[in-house]
């Protein structure tokens, strides 16, 4: 058997500091290595960033926990904070329960004199005079309905509460039915979700004053790929929810609708290398560059599984190619090329070309999971250096790498980076509830770490996944302690190595060899697990 050489956590190994005083790096998720505490400290900074954005809202006799009081930001942050947060449900449930009769969800809660409610028509806000608060939907937004479904998935995986799901599911389905049928939201001719002409998923319209967030007769309308990949993901999530409740017929209906939407996306939005920024419907746009404009949702599209491996790799290759030619310090564009001017933003300002850590996080995860593992790790290490320099991660960066903190929540990018480490680098994916089924696809061989311990789970349900890893000349070993009854393993083999034998709990096991790009993986299933931990040894 390949033996582990050190116990973790520890403060010093072989005369080198490899841990922190008082183990500040320990939480969900966290990593301890025998080499240095850099990755663990990076995760700690990201968690602290998200903790710092946590607030409470008191409305209609309820106490809501929000990580920003916009459900969009909150859901994007849920992909990380689900691991430690005890109050994941209050804000999400409030948004679900206040759903408009036609299926539209509201999105944000603001003080009465923060006049977001004046930016829209009366049917897009609700007043709470006793609390001096308003509940608002910026009408031009086309991402809320699918994000509520995404948030429901994060919540349900931490609870497995079928009674909650039975109550919530009709609302979730009604929301997706609304966004795919309402004449303001749906382009019937092309079978795709539409929105006013904005920069990717943002909330201001080209050629309109910033105080107008409505959809009107003269609003320039376009189709943006990210809205549609989000709805595609939501449809597949609704299928999964229905299957959990033994509604097989409904599950297949949602899967069929998802496939039709995907077909339309590729028919109208795919340029052979990536998804174009916007397909304009009733106007000619700002210039003639939309077909070559790479917007941030391309990285999200991959992680929503609307692209297959080959298509995903083409998108990643476009980012790699632009890294070589850009004058920016990094290729994690909000949009590239930027517009000459969009609203009052000039190139490099805000989402008109600033560099985005949420793009970095999503792109790193996509690369790690699609055969560009070294590139994914490179993105993480570059973000680690920025966080070491600044002490945190910012919402956006200027093209010269100086922070551009105004305009949005830095927690959004922090969450995307945590997810890249957790579901990409560590490759621990909950495909059931409370990690009772795991897709295990670790990529640690692309790092310089030779021995480590990685810990993740859900604090609220006391679900713990604890992985030990070591690599030596003769092979590598993973010990996985988890609640999983079944593990689908997808194990990366280091470059220039081959597997001579696979052992699971000291018993030889068959495997399939799977090539992803130039990377080689061993695929096998471990079922009806009754031994803890599961020990996986790959002998070279």
Give residue ranges: language-model regions.
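Non-catalytic C-terminal accessory modules of carbohydrate-active enzymes
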Residues: 362-540
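Catalytic cores of carbohydrate-active enzymes
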Residues: 8, 12-34, 40-49, 66-70, ...
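The feature captures the catalytic groove of carbohydrate-active enzymes
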Residues: 110-147, 180-256, 272-300, 341-358
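Generic long, charged, amphipathic alpha-helical segments
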Residues: 332-349, 451-462
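Solvent-exposed loop and edge beta-strand segments that line ligand/cofactor-binding
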Residues: 4-24, 56-83, 130-143, 213-230, ...
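Aromatic-rich carbohydrate-recognition surfaces in CAZymes
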Residues: 67-195, 224-228, 232, 354-364, ...
């Amino acid at each position: 058997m390949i033996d582990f050489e050190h116990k973790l956590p520890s403060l010093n190994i072989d005369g080198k500091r490899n841990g922190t005083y008082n183990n500040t790096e320990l939480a969900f998720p966290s990593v301890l290595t025998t080499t240095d505490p850099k990755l663990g400290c990076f995760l700690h900074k990201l968690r602290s960033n998200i903790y710092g954005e946590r607030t409470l809202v008191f409305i209609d006799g309820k106490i809501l926990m929000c990580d920003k009081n916009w459900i969009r930001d909150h859901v994007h942050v849920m992909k990380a904070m689900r691991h430690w947060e005890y109050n994941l449900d209050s804000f999400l449930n409030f948004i679900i329960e206040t759903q408009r009769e036609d299926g539209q969800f509201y999105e944000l809660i603001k003080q009465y004199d923060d006049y977001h409610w004046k930016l829209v028509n009366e049917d897009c806000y609700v007043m709470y005079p006793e609390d001096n608060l308003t509940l608002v939907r910026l009408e031009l937004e086309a991402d809320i309905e699918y994000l509520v479904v995404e948030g429901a998935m994060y919540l349900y995986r931490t609870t497995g509460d079928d009674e909650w799901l039975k109550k919530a599911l009709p609302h979730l389905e009604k929301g997706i039915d609304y966004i795919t049928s309402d004449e303001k939201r749906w382009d019937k001719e092309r079978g795709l979700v539409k929105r006013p002409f904005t920069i990717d998923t943002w909330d201001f319209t080209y050629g309109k004053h910033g105080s107008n967030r409505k959809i009107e007769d003269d609003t320039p309308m376009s189709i943006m790929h990210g809205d549609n990949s989000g709805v595609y993901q939501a449809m597949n999530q609704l299928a999964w929810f229905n299957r959990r409740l033994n509604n097989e017929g409904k599950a297949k209906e949602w899967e069929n609708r998802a496939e039709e939407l995907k077909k339309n996306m590729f028919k109208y939005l795919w340029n052979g290398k990536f998804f174009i920024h916007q397909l304009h419907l009733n106007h000619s746009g700002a210039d003639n560059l939309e077909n070559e404009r790479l917007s941030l949702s391309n990285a999200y599209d991959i992680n929503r599984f609307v692209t297959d491996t080959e298509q995903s790799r083409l998108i990643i290759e476009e980012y790699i190619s632009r890294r070589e030619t850009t004058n920016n310090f990094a290729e994690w564009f909000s949009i590239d090329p930027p517009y000459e001017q969009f609203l009052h933003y000039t190139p490099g300002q805000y989402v008109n070309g600033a560099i985005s850590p949420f793009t970095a996080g999503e792109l790193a995860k996509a690369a790690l999971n699609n055969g560009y593992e070294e590139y994914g790790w490179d993105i993480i290490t570059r973000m680690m250096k920025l966080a070491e320099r600044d002490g945190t991660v910012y919402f956006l960066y200027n093209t010269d790498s100086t922070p551009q903190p105004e305009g949005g929540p830095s927690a959004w990018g922090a969450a995307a980076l945590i997810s890249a480490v957790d579901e990409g680098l560590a490759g621990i994916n909950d495909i059931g509830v409370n990690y009772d089924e795991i897709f295990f696809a670790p990529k640690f061989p692309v790092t310089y770490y030779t021995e480590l311990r990685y810990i993740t789970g859900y604090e609220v349900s006391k679900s713990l996944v604890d992985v030990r890893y070591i690599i030596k000349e003769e092979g590598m070993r993973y010990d996985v302690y988890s609640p999983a009854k079944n593990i689908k393993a997808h194990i990366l083999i280091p470059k220039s190595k081959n597997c001579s034998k696979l052992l699971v709990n000291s018993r030889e096991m068959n495997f399939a060899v799977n090539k992803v790009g130039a990377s080689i993986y061993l695929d096998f299933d471990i079922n009806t697990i009754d031994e803890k931990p599961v020990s996986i040894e790959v002998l070279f």
